[in-house]
């Protein structure tokens, strides 16, 4: 039976290669160790130096804070079986003369992968291997992963750049399965008169966020976003973060039906670049804001794969 399964897997692999699979994850010898050393767990977060923070601070000129996080609630779109339920409770009314009462809430949710979210490196693998070739099987416990937990990331402050691809294409929302090209990115940046720099947080406006809590079924079924070529081009600019106003940052489903969410592997596994998903970018786009100081901090979930976040753009 085992030999039969292996034979079938080999046939499947050969069929994929003969069909011209558009992207294949590089071998461990090609991608490891990472540029920051064999034991590194921070990846692109290493780009947040004091100089990078000071450079971001210089972009704050009018003191305006723009929220980039969606509201967490039961009516937001969910991928798969994820959920977010809030149950409020009256906990007590004390017996002191001022009769102070208290209320709390119980949240039932997958806190790392709902709403506006930050993808840590433990979130995605190539087979059994994470970023920097740490192994899932060697670092998995019931209460969290012992390597690459999102608690390692800390606060990130850097120059944020909005690439308004929807605006460049002259539409409110890109098509349901539109793959953003390198030419789209270059054209939008030229129109906005912006040049990408190492350490940037690159946020891509597709307009897909307009469907949030309005057409959830369509929102999660597919989405426009970057593909393999655009992702590799962006990562070549040495960003700290890649983000978008859709659920996976990338186009989904991928036009190549043989592969699933390859940009997740390209960013998180191969290159150690964190992703920001489900961002609220409509206000930035409407105001024509291309550069700003981005501030984001994942929750310190020990051994977690990611975190819901509420990033802000300050200008």
Show which residues each predicted segment covers.
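Bacterial N-terminal signal peptides
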Residues: 5-15
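Active-/binding-site microenvironments in catalytic and ligand-binding cores
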Residues: 19-315
